[in-house]
UniProtKB/Swiss-Prot annotation:
InterPro entries: PHEMX_LEL, Tetraspanin/Peripherin, Tetraspanin_animals, Tetraspanin_EC2_sf. It comes from the Eukaryota. Gene3D superfamilies: Tetraspanin. Pfam families: Tetraspanin. This is Tetraspanin-32. The keyword Membrane applies. It comes from Mus musculus (Mouse). The chain crosses the membrane at residues 15-35, 61-81, 90-110, 203-223. GO terms for cellular component: cell surface; integrin alphaIIb-beta3 complex. Keywords: Membrane, Transmembrane, Transmembrane helix.
Amino acid sequence: MGHWNRIKIAKCQILITNFLVLLLGLSMATMVVVIHFGDHFTVIGHASLERNPYETLRYWAFYVGISLAGLLSLGAALSTIATVREAHGLMAAGFLCFALSFCILVQVAFWRFYNPTQVEDAVLDTYDFVYDQAMKSPSSNWWQELAVIQDTFLCCGKKSPFGLLVSTGAIMCQGREAMREDCLQSIRNVLWTHYSIASILTCTSLALTVYAMMLCAFLWFAIHSYHGLDRKGRYSLTPPRSHGFQTQEPSLFRWT
């Protein structure tokens, strides 16, 4: 396979990869917005705590996710334009965006590996605090906040390790509400669903980012060295030259 064929294949591959990266960035931004502004996480974040541990994690995840989605989309756009226009400067900028995205993704993966339950613990601690305060003073605003949380997660109270509702929680879980799931388990199920989606997006982003960086590096060197790519220039017609009694046909030459 010649050098020109390899470059043509690399161009097609990077265009396809950039399209997938754009879709991935859009999916990531959508997931971040849903998590940040969704009802399940908003009611937990707005709990009346002096220092809500989950609220900090929620804003951190939002800004990191939006920044990552923006970098991925920008890298895909720059490298696509660079591929079409054969601009090594734009290709280098696209490679830089992918490299920054890769660094962020690695940090997120390490954080997820070493702190697998940090978000879950923060959410459950917030619910436990609201629940305990509501049980201590049923006539306070804590009871209303607890009711909003339980209506959002479609759950009621929390069960003891033996599978029974605690005595104070049995008061509020009567009638149709008694058929609802334990709130601790319901919260875990919601978090696990979002964890699964986030893990899939993270792993896919890592794979596509590494592949995009490899293609960007290859095409940058190809464009920079002008090997196999069409040289851009203009053609002009030279006047006929006489060599003795022989005449030469007009010829074309390229100059850059």
